[in-house]
């Protein structure tokens, strides 16, 4: 990271969106994760809490993640809720994420008729010097 030596710090935010709001049982819900104003992003993560009666996690489709490793975790909490933790990290020296782009798609299957109201929380962007920017 020569970039980080100049005192540059990680910036930006991630937003999630779906093509529509209502999904029928067994329909695939594609949640687009878009980055805006990204600077020096070497790792990213956020939480997406969901009700396992509503959704089943199918997978992640990387779009603009360069050489980042997908370390996403789908976790069942003791209170019965589930949270998906989409997480991508550069292992070793790889190009950081910059600018504005569609980063990846989270694929969920609707287990019954649902209105998509999930929100990303606890978002973190990290640079090569481990500076953290929350969103």
Task: State what each model feature region is.
Residues 1-135:
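Acidic, low-complexity intrinsically disordered segments
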